[in-house]
Curated annotation (Swiss-Prot):
GO terms for cellular component: chloroplast; ribosome; small ribosomal subunit. InterPro entries: Ribosomal_uS7, Ribosomal_uS7_bac/org-type, Ribosomal_uS7_dom, Ribosomal_uS7_dom_sf. CDD domains: uS7_Chloroplast. It is found in: Plastid, Chloroplast. The keyword Membrane does not apply. Part of the 30S ribosomal subunit. Belongs to the universal ribosomal protein uS7 family. One of the primary rRNA binding proteins, it binds directly to 16S rRNA where it nucleates assembly of the head domain of the 30S subunit. SUPFAM superfamilies: Ribosomal protein S7. PANTHER family: RIBOSOMAL PROTEIN S7 (PTHR11205). Keywords: Chloroplast, Plastid, Ribonucleoprotein, Ribosomal protein, RNA-binding, rRNA-binding. This is Small ribosomal subunit protein uS7c. It holds the Pfam family Ribosomal_S7.
Length: 168
């Protein structure tokens, strides 16, 4: 029995404007130095500009972009026989996969320079929606590593099938 108490999972409330938990998670990722009102303003302005550009519901565009970036597998380093191997495992479409995709989108925003954060966030979400950009490359790179190291997984065929579902 573990001695440490098990932490209960916190439930996130949806954001007040779009009533979406994913938008609230994005706001928490944009947040710096505890200035949540600034984070809300950045995200809402970016979503408003996305709605103006695409003429679609900005939350649906954002959700589709997040689905495009969300990985289906992850790799964990394991030490076996004196060597460190990257062992892939399947990710269910849950908070961990969603957190990775949001992290990659924010990293992509940080790599863009010379623009305000609203423009960088809008551009990266639109790139993810079109299946281009840094975050999509990061996901594809992770999937290539997982396929290359599938032999180290307990069930290699499950890893390959999870990645091939994306291609179809």
């Amino acid at each position: 029995m573990p001695r440490r108490p098990i932490n209960k999972k916190r439930t996130l409330l949806p954001d007040p404007v779009y009533n979406s938990v994913s938008v609230h998670m994005l706001v928490n990722r944009v947040l710096k130095s505890g200035k949540k009102s600034v984070a809300y303003r950045i995200v809402y302005n970016a979503l408003k500009e996305i709605g103006d550009v695409t003429q679609k519901n900005p939350v649906e565009v954002f959700e589709k972009a997040l689905d495009n970036v969300t990985p289906r597998v992850e790799v964990k380093p394991r030490r076996r026989a004196g060597a460190i191997q990257m062992v892939p495992r399947v990710l269910r479409l849950g908070d961990r996969a969603r957190a990775n995709s949001l992290r990659w989108i924010m990293e992509a925003c940080d790599k863009r320079s010379g623009q305000p954060m609203v423009t960088k966030l809008k551009s990266e979400i639109l790139d993810a929606y079109k299946k281009t950009g840094f975050a999509i490359r990061k996901k594809e790179e992770l999937h290539k590593i997982a396929i290359a190291n599938a032999m180290y997984a307990k069930k290699p065929q499950v890893i390959i099938n999870a990645i091939n579902l994306l291609v179809d």
